[in-house]
Each structure stands twice: as structure tokens, then as C-alpha cells.
Curated annotation (Swiss-Prot):
Biological function: Centriole-enriched microtubule-binding protein involved in centriole biogenesis. In collaboration with CEP295 and POC1B, is required for the centriole-to-centrosome conversion by ensuring the formation of bona fide centriole wall. Functions as a linker component that maintains centrosome cohesion. Associates with CROCC and regulates its stability and localization to the centrosome.
Gene Ontology molecular-function annotations: microtubule binding
Family annotation (InterPro entries): CEP44, CEP44_CC
Pfam family, any one: CEP44
Entry's localization field: Cytoplasm, Cytoskeleton, Microtubule organizing center, Centrosome; Cytoplasm, Cytoskeleton, Microtubule organizing center, Centrosome, Centriole; Cytoplasm, Cytoskeleton, Spindle pole; Midbody
A GO CC term attached to the entry: centrosome
Coiled coil: 221-260, 353-378
Domain of life: Eukaryota
Alphabetic keyword roster: Coiled coil, Cytoplasm, Cytoskeleton
Biased composition (Basic and acidic residues): 201-210
Region (Binds with microtubules and centrioles): 11-188
Name of the featured protein: Centrosomal protein of 44 kDa
Signal peptide: none
Amino acid sequence: MATGDVKGCIRKLEQRLRTLNYPRDVDYTGLIKGDPSASLPIISYTFTCYSTSIAEILISFGIELTTKSDLRFIEAVYKVLRDVFNYKPILTKQQFLQCAFSERKIQIICDIVDCVVKKHKEITGQNKVKSQLVKKVVSAKDQCEVFYPEDVSVQPSVKTTQKKPLVERHAGSEFLLPTKCYSSALVEDIEEEEPTSDSEGGSHLEHEMESPFETAETTPNSEQIELLRKQLAECQEKLQRLDCVEQRLQSLETSMKGKIIIDETDWNNLLSRVLLLETEGLLQSKKTDFSVPSEFACISEQRTSSRMTNEICSNLKTKADIPESHHQSSGYSFVLSADTSPIAIDINYSSLTEDSNETTKQRMERITKMMEETSKLLKCSNNT
């Protein structure tokens, strides 16, 4: 179809939207392109927001049009058009969701708006007729009061039938003077002559009927007043408690200035670390104490070795002064004396090493005992 048809369809759609009082902005470019995202909001507004009676009909059929995807929404709309309005669209569901068929989509939207508006008018017209019938019945019962005065006979005369009953309306009320109503025709004449006055009287009656309820609502009961008093007392108590809490907080802040708060776990960790550092310091001091006697032992060994060498030299000198004959006779003894000196040195050194080994063993035992004691102390601190 030509572009002029698209413009004409858009004009028709604008007219329908005016009848709906559509408050949102319309994406005309999307409608011309055939974008379904431009037409779906209009359809959802016509079904859900325009008329409450239409929404009630949809609920009665068990159809929901909100919180759905585009495909589910179109399926529900086609179901409503088929079941409620007996309307079959030109396009299929898949074609409607495509970005094409702009003129046909606009025509479908216009048809949907027409169907909804027509249905709304039908429902509102039926409701108006029902309300008017109810009002007529009520007004006929209230207005017509048949009475028979004492002076007048029960059978009416011809003159009285020709005269119309006198009706006097008081402002703000529906009370009538006593009238003579002899037939239903007279009642119909009264209703036809004074429709406006009936509507005004009905409004006054409604106002009067509403006013006592309003006064009853505005005047609170004694129970409500007592409840309010109790609530006020509770609020005052809570405010006093809050004041006490604020005072305590201020006192705590003043007392805790310059102080640091630490968790128990962190404090225990710090204590354990301090104990470890102290034990390490003690062990290092004891190691230094152990190293001092070892130095003394080395010095003593050096002194003993120097003494032994001096003695050997002195012995050699004395033996050189002895004559050869004496050397021959006592050569065996010289050899023995020469051989015995290193043996004595070895014996002295072995005794020293044994003493040093014993002292190191004792020291190691002491160190192990100290380590065990420190580990026990650490376990006790962690448990506490």
C-alpha cells in the first residue's frame, strides 16, 4: 500500500488515542516501520488501564496481561479478542511480532480500541439503567404516602381526582407533606415533572446519610483515648531510657579516652609472642655462658701443650750432657722416657674431651627442659 494510507491510519489512531486519553508518548517512527515495541504499550493500556470493567472481565476469564514476554502477551491478547470480543485479527501472532506490516498493525490497534470502547459503553449503560430503576423504586416508596383525612370520605370525588397532589420539598431533606395518591399515573406524572428536584433531593439525602457516619468517625471513643494515653506513656519511658543510655555513652567515652581496646585472642597472641621472645633471650644468654668455659678450656689446653713442650726440651738438654757410655747403658730408658711423653699428652687431652662432652650433655638436657617448660606455659596461656 502507499505511504498515504499509512498516514491516514496514523490519523485514525490519533483519534482513538484521544478517546482513550492516552497519557504516554507514541513512537510514530516505530509504528511506521512496523516495530511491535511501539504498538504493544497501546494495546496493554487499552485492556488494563482504560476501563476497570474491562479489567474485571479479564480477571473473570482468568487472563493476565501483565509481567509477560511479548509472545505470551500477544497470545493472551488474541485469546481475549477471540473469546470476549469475537474478533479475529488479520495478522497471525508471528507476523505481528515481526518488524513489518505497519498499516495492518495500526488497523488492528484501531479495531481493538473500538471494541474496548464499545464494550465499556455497553457495561456502563447497563449499570446506569439498573441504578435508575433502583432510584425510581426508592423514590416512589418515599414520596407516595396515602392517607385519609377525617373530614373527607374514603371515596374520592371527581374534582379531587382531577387536581394534582401538592408536593413541598424542604431544603436538605426529602420529607414531604401528606398528599393524596390515588393511582400510579399520578406518581409517574410527578416523577416526569420534577426529575431535577429528585436528583437534588437524592444528593441532599446522601449528604445527610453520610454526615452521621462522619461525625461518629470523628468523635473518638474513650477506649481509643486510653490507648493513645498508654502509647504516650510508653513513648515517654522509652525517651527516658534513651537519655540514660546517652549519658552512659558519654561517660564511657570520657573514661576511655587515650585507651586502646584489644580482643582477647589478639591479647593472648601478644602474650605468647612476648614469652617466646623472652625464652629466646634466655637461651641466647645461656649459650654465651656456655661459650665462655669452652674458651677457657682451649686456653688451658694451649697452656698444657706449651708446658709439655717445655718439659720435653729441658729433658733433651739434660740428656745431651750425659756421656755416651751412660747413653749406651741407659739408652733403653731414654727411649722409654721419650716415648712416654706423647702418651701422657693423649691421656690428658682425652680426659679433657670427656669432661667437655659431659658438660655439653648436661647443658643440652637443661635446654630441653627449659623448652618443655616454655611450651607448657604457652599451652596454659592459650587455654586461658
